[in-house]
Design a protein with these regions (language model features):
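Mobile cap/lid helix-loop segments that gate and shape the active-site cleft of serine hydrolases
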Residues: 10, 147-182, 188
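Short beta-strand/loop motif that positions the catalytic acidic residue
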Residues: 186, 192-194, 198
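Catalytic histidine neighborhood in serine/cysteine hydrolases
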Residues: 214-227
Length: 227
């Protein structure tokens, strides 16, 4: 039985838009003795979470000896910071379980969430009464898979609209969730892949991210497949 771990002991922040999504969680796929873990973010355009990008991916990571935690994050009608707060909290929660390294992986819109977690993080609040909030939310690595990296150009408009809601055409919000515009030299290393013929999420998304990482001397590996 895979344990379901709530991210918060009480109602999660930013829940006013969707009380039925008040308790996001991670589903545990632990490998005994594993020193590293990956938070898995399924795609779905910020409207749903695709099942085939969740549990099967965790099981694949398990076969490689890596523990995995599938994130049940909030989607439309929750907007903007709600999904990101879930991803950041998930990294802290998984880190609290004793893993030496915690990465984050995401597909399509889940890849956008993965990239946001890798570019908007903090070291934790040492004065927080919640011990989990004292931990860093910076992933040790991130793995965007055919990700909606940018909400500015070459974007998947459905993901942009579902994530930002009424703010979908406000550039400060658009830029904040466009990872290529938020990379710094402290951004964690990345493993990026895409297909050159992707019609839903253009390959330029991954190319923009790789370019930004290169300019900031952040280690990355990029794979573009022809199909």
């Amino acid at each position: 039985m895979n344990r379901i771990i709530p991210l918060w002991s009480e109602i999660a922040p930013y829940t006013q838009e969707s009380p039925e999504q008040a308790q996001p969680s991670v589903k545990e796929f632990a490998v005994p003795g594993s020193r590293g873990a990956v938070v898995v973010c399924p795609g779905g355009g910020y409207e749903f979470k695709a099942p085939y990008e969740g549990d099967p991916i965790a099981e694949m990571l398990n076969r490689a000896g890596i523990s995995a935690y599938v994130l049940d994050y909030r989607v439309k009608p929750c907007h903007c910071l709600a999904p990101l707060s879930d991803a950041s909290r998930a990294i802290r929660v998984v880190r609290s379980l004793g893993y030496e390294k915690v990465g984050i992986l995401g597909f399509s819109a889940g890849g956008n969430l993965c990239c946001s977690a890798a570019t908007h993080y903090d070291a934790g609040n040492p004065d927080s009464p919640d011990p989990i909030e004292r931990l860093s939310s910076r992933p040790d690595a991130f793995m965007p898979c055919y990700a909606v990296v940018s909400l500015c150009q070459y974007t998947h408009i459905g993901s942009r609209n579902s994530l930002l809601g009424a703010h979908a055409n406000e550039m400060p919000f658009v830029r904040f969730f466009s990872a290529e515009q938020n990379v710094t030299p402290d951004t964690p290393p990345a493993f990026i892949w895409h297909t050159s013929t992707d019609e839903a999420v253009p390959v330029e998304n991954s190319l923009l991210l790789a370019t930004a990482l290169a300019k900031n001397a952040v280690p990355f590996e990029l794979h573009i497949f022809p199909i």
